[in-house]
Amino acid sequence: MAPGAPSSSPSPILAALLFSSLVLSPALAIVVYTDREIYGAVGSQVTLHCSFWSSEWVSDDISFTWRYQPEGGRDAISIFHYAKGQPYIDEVGAFKERIQWVGDPRWKDGSIVIHNLDYSDNGTFTCDVKNPPDIVGKTSQVTLYVFEKVPTRYGVVLGAVIGGILGVVLLLLLLFYLIRYCWLRRQAALQRRLSAMEKGRFHKSSKDSSKRGRQTPVLYAMLDHSRSTKAASEKKSKGLGESRKDKK
């Protein structure tokens, strides 16, 4: 290499980007979803839901496969298969004529219904989906429990308890605000009554003051008149006394 010529090796930033795109980016794979547990009563029916996510468009070659492993068993057997737009139901096994296809691949739905449940149906059901070219991914499992009478789920009980507590809290809050409203209303009425009483007292005091103001000159006039009458009477009496002396 000639002195001063630029290096032909890739820059560290470009190498890091290439490494992250090839190594660090996760590979996309199909993801299948089912319930974890489902409960049913003897003689009833249950729906085993199965859906999926795929990075590819729904292919015409999409397939769904359901397998069943009995409770306490080791091996799983195929009980249902969907491919090329057609459902294939087991015709010789324990679920003969009891499985119904209710899925719709266009909506990424591979659900089935099991009719006329029995205690022997207890076990694990596995849903497997292939959507070529997206065929790599994990299956999903749902466990079926069959009872004579379906028990109340813990979540339902918990929800009922929480709902009851919230109802009581709301009732207490409503009662608190109602009592507070009545108390404030009563205080306002009492305040209005006190204000009216104060105004009445003020008006009465003003009237009394004005009445006393009007009565004062009259009293003074009456007093002056009384004094004048008394003086005149005394003067008259004195004059009569002097006239009597003169006659003697």
UniProtKB/Swiss-Prot annotation:
**Positions of the UniProt region annotated as Disordered:** 222-248
**Signal sequence extent:** 1-29
Phylogenetic placement of the source organism: Eukaryota, Metazoa, Chordata, Craniata, Vertebrata
Name any one Pfam family assigned in the record: Myelin-PO_C
Kindly give the membrane topology term recorded for this protein. Single-pass type I membrane protein
Give all residue intervals belonging to the Ig-like V-type domain. Answer: 30-143
Protein's name in the database: Myelin protein P0
Chief localisation class:
membrane
